[in-house]
Amino acid sequence: MGTVSSRRLWWPLPLLLLLLLGPPGARAQEDDDGDYEELVLALRSEEDGPADALQHGATATFHRCAKDPWRLPGTYVVVLKDSDAHRSQPERTARRLQAQAARRGYLIKLLHVFHHLLPGFLVKMSRDLLELALRLPHVDYIEEDSSVFAQSIPWNLERITPARYRADEYQPPNGGSLVEVYLLDTSIQSSHREIEGRVMVTDFESVPEEDGTRFHRQASKCDSHGTHLAGVVSGRDAGVAKGASLRSLHVLNCQGKGTVSSALIGLEFIRKSQLVQPVGPLVVLLPLAGGYSRVLNAACRRLAGAGVVLVAAAGNFRDDACLYSPASAPEVITVGATNAQDQPLTLGTLGTNFGRCVDLFAPGEDIIGASSDCSTCFVSRSGTSQAAAHVAGIAAMMLSAEPELTLAELRQRLIHFSAKDVINEAWFPEDQRVLTPNLVATLPPSTHGAGWQLFCRTVWSAHSGPTRMATAMARCAPDEELLSCSSFSRSGKRRGERIEAQGGRRVCLAPNAFGGEGVYAVARCCLLPQANCSVHTAPPAGAGMGTRAHCHQQGHVLTGCSSHWEMKDLGTHKPPVLKPRGQPDQCMGHSGASTHASCCYAPGLECKVKEHGLPAPQEQVTVACEEGWTLTGCSALPGTSHVLGAYAVDDTCVVRSRDVSTTGSTSEEAVAAVAICCRSRHLA
């Protein structure tokens, strides 16, 4: 998008007065028609300066895309504070901005007002007015618009079918007919035989001009990205959920390019449609990616809070998915791509994104689907867009079988039933391997009967950073229960972890240590209806004694252990036995550390502790839960100062230590992994 000119405008005084003080009746008529473009005059200030200068004296914050080529300066999303979000406040704030800018003589164009998704508005104005806008009392933050891109450059149907259920043809448990899927993409050729009668092309269109031309090409001349994805989701022959209906929103131009603001307006269109005519379960497919966007992530959070399932492409940049939106939004199910050998998708020098913001992977290479070249044509395409379309189709089938599933329940089921440990992790950067889930999506063996299964997943925090007071924080989804907390540092310099309540929710905190390079907090998040959980803490016991913490309340069981300390190095500590005979399960900690027992009561819940230790230090020690049991807690017994941390991988507890060849460890510094395994007695 181009910006409105910011040069000084010298207009004759009579004409200026006529524009600003023209007949009120005429202006009211223009407003009623909805075609009146809000143009206000202003006075030039200075040339664009550094973004940091915008914060001087302002109460709001300014955000822009970290990737300069994707920025669209001159167009801004202004987001208001929720506490001030009266329905008329966005218009009032926009007009106040225009009135104040009028004294400075610029042109400001009001492009859109948000009501149904988040309180705010979209404006086109000079960057010189940003500081003025940031000072407005109701403004929370302002984000510069930026570009988003399509992420696309029948083995796939076989791959998503569990091996023991594979037949000569793809036979899904249902067609997903009770679910409506919204697709934000390019235009779609709805007359293609693969999707004819299954796609409704809405009248929504918000696309930027194509690069190098001022004219939009006809829909039939587009690159068929939207048509292909519609076929992957619900095509008659090559589709995943063959009975799902689709609604198409046109937010990407024929070059596969859109904007954050267009995606926002599209999401608000969906929310408004949901309010006007509530229907059954909704899935929104977001096969696009742009730079990290606070406002786009916030919009996804709002829509997910309204019960909508959002599935997004991780991105095709062979990079950390947390650097992109909407892939980085925690409320979005983010999907990476694999090939026919279950290996990460490679696209020349690029490939699938990865990291802690990815939930799982799905087929994304050489996917056969509908082509807009003709009504019977097919084409092969690759990318994380195709992978996300597979998961959207699987989600549609799961929601058709169980329409009351929440987002948290759906995500946990997708993770639980995925094929595990099939991806070659060596493809990922070394620092991302432990963070990236080794999961490839498959259909559940049955879309019913999982009601009593205990589902858990591992959630990694962002890296804390290297400062002394830096603290990493991992949190679960609102419908999940935090059952345990652990930490991990590649340097080994950390100060443990603990669970705290913040804003009415429990979070997992892990502080960095002096001289450390940063730390991760690792939360174990589970679905545990009717749970009553608490943390019991035992202070440091003193020299020569281990610290013990256990559950005090009757009926509560131990689900996790953690500990934290203030000193730089705890030193070595030879631990006693985990559970003295005749005593309940308990957490053991170093004598110099505070030890925390995470305890929960839930109907039918039972848990047990498993320990596996080695007499000499090893780089990795693991202990796994038996079939039918779910890992809820993972920790290391206090036996060595060389432990890097502990984390859960599916139902296996992993404890990592520094390379023994460089540590000078002794045989007394044993390493032990402690797993807490739980299940519902309804399944026993």
From Swiss-Prot:
Q: Show which residues constitute the signal peptide.
A: 1-28
Q: Which residue range or ranges hold the Peptidase S8 domain?
A: 154-460
Q: Which residues carry the site feature described as Cleavage?
A: Q151, S152, R217, Q218
Keywords associated with the record = Apoptosis, Autocatalytic cleavage, Calcium, Cholesterol metabolism, Cytoplasm, Disulfide bond, Endoplasmic reticulum, Endosome, Glycoprotein, Golgi apparatus, Hydrolase, Lipid metabolism, Lysosome, Phosphoprotein, Protease, Secreted, Serine protease, Signal, Steroid metabolism, Sterol metabolism, Sulfation, Zymogen
Q: What is its main location?
A: cytoplasm
Record's subcellular location? Cytoplasm; Secreted; Endosome; Lysosome
* Gene3D superfamilies membership: Peptidase S8 propeptide/proteinase inhibitor I9, Peptidase S8/S53 domain, Proprotein convertase subtilisin/kexin type 9
Query: Which residues are the active-site ones?
Result: D185 (charge relay system), H225 (charge relay system), S385 (charge relay system)
**PTM comment text:** Cleavage by furin and PCSK5 generates a truncated inactive protein that is unable to induce LDLR degradation.
Any Gene Ontology CC annotation: lysosome
Q: What cofactor does this one take?
A: Ca(2+)
* Biological-process GO terms, alphabetical: apoptotic process; cholesterol metabolic process; low-density lipoprotein particle receptor catabolic process; proteolysis; regulation of neuron apoptotic process
Which residues are in the Inhibitor I9 domain?
Answer: 75-148
Region C-terminal domain: list its residue ranges. 451-684
Describe regulators of its activity: Its proteolytic activity is autoinhibited by the non-covalent binding of the propeptide to the catalytic domain. Inhibited by EGTA.
Q: Where are the transmembrane segments?
A: none
Prodomain positions = 29-151
GO MF assignments: apolipoprotein binding; low-density lipoprotein particle binding; serine-type endopeptidase activity; very-low-density lipoprotein particle binding
Domain free text:
The C-terminal domain (CRD) is essential for the LDLR-binding and degrading activities. The catalytic domain is responsible for mediating its self-association.
Which protein family is it in?
Belongs to the peptidase S8 family.
Q: How does it assemble?
A: Monomer. Can self-associate to form dimers and higher multimers which may have increased LDLR degrading activity. The precursor protein but not the mature protein may form multimers. Interacts with APOB, VLDLR, LRP8/APOER2 and BACE1. The full-length immature form (pro-PCSK9) interacts with SCNN1A, SCNN1B and SCNN1G. The pro-PCSK9 form (via C-terminal domain) interacts with LDLR. Interacts (via the C-terminal domain) with ANXA2 (via repeat Annexin 1); the interaction inhibits the degradation of LDLR.
Q: Per its record, how is this protein called by name?
A: Proprotein convertase subtilisin/kexin type 9
Q: Which organism is it from?
A: Plecturocebus moloch
